[in-house]
Design a protein with these regions (language model features):
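Radical SAM [4Fe-4S] cluster-binding motif and immediate context
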Residues: 24, 176, 181-258
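Short, solvent-exposed loop/turn segments at secondary-structure boundaries
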Residues: 17-18, 81-85, 227-231
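Flexible loop residues that form catalytic
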Residues: 8-11, 74, 132, 160, ...
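Short beta-strands and strand-loop turn motifs
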Residues: 15, 70-76, 219, 252-255
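Glycine- and acidic-residue-enriched helix-capping/strand-helix junction motifs
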Residues: 14-29
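N-terminal [4Fe-4S]-dependent radical SAM core
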Residues: 9-18, 49, 83, 158-205
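Extreme N-terminal starter segment of soluble prokaryotic enzymes
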Residues: 1-4
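Glycine-rich beta-alpha loop elements in corrinoid/cobalamin-binding modules
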Residues: 28, 32-39, 44-172
Length: 258
């Protein structure tokens, strides 16, 4: 299945953050993309981070011609959990542009998990609740086979104006089962140029754990829950080695909640 991944955080629309010149690639988005690609789906990425309008997605919709648009926000980035109204509206605009072309749309974010009716009202076909890699796998497999999706756990959808909520699934415990994020989908040079011009060094983001037992209201617990799960040291080192060999950052941000 051809799946176009995107997310709804536009750094230029957040003037305070854009002025810092410290954009990080959408880690959660490219993690999900890598997982679906590993399972045999054809994936592409429309990265919104460095642009200022959702209208540019039209080019990717026309050139890639996806069967499914997945707006999959980066749950590792705390900025995406303080959803700004303009970012939400940008997501709605992307949904509308995809639906205009007859493309099905799934959305995964902390905001859509909390406000799923707003996203369904905007035209989304599916809202994926919480941590969504396994949910998205089952959804994509069913869509590819034209099978019924109502039995897929972790989805909210509408059937004849009636909202159907299949309930949340438990979070993943074995994080080593996930591949290294699809860093090849990122225009690394564009990020490097901004970092070096604004800060004099180049930083990339990584996550080694998911979940946190504490109760801060800004973290990723709406997505990854309050059970603490970690990658093995070997799995983490493999990603560090990949990034150092291929992209040569001089700094890493470990964006774990704890």
């Amino acid at each position: 299945m051809k799946i176009l991944f995107s997310h709804s955080y536009y750094y230029p629309l957040d003037e305070k953050q854009w002025a810092k010149k410290q954009p990080y690639p959408p880690l959660g988005t490219i993690q999900a993309a890598a997982y679906l690609r590993q399972l045999g789906h054809e994936v592409a990425l429309f990265d919104t981070n460095l642009i200022d309008s959702p209208v540019y997605i039209q080019q990717d919709l026309e050139s890639f011609q996806p069967e499914l648009l997945v707006i999959y926000d980066d749950g590792f980035n705390y900025l995406t959990k303080m959803c700004l109204t303009n970012m939400r509206e940008a997501a709605f605009d992307m949904i509308a542009l995809a639906k205009k072309r007859g493309i099905q749309v799934a959305v995964s974010s902390s905001d859509s998990t909390d406000q799923f009716n707003m996203y369904l009202d905007a035209g989304a076909d599916f809202v994926l609740l919480g941590e969504a890699e396994e949910t998205l796998k089952e959804l994509a497999d069913n869509l590819k086979k034209n099978s019924d999706t109502s039995g897929v756990l972790g989805i909210v959808s509408r059937m004849e104006s009636e909202t159907q909520n299949s309930g949340r699934r438990t979070v993943m415990r074995n994080l080593d089962s996930l591949p290294i994020p699809a860093w090849d989908l990122i225009d690394i040079d564009a990020y490097r140029k901004i970092w070096l011009g604004g800060n004099g060094y180049f930083s990339l983001n990584m996550s080694t754990t998911r979940g946190c037992p504490y109760k801060c209201n800004w973290c990723a617990k709406p997505i990854y829950g309050q059970k603490y799960n970690s990658r093995s040291p070997e799995h983490v080192v493999r990603e560090i080695e990949y990034l150092l060999n291929h992209h040569k950052p001089t700094h890493f941000l470990m964006c774990d909640d704890i």
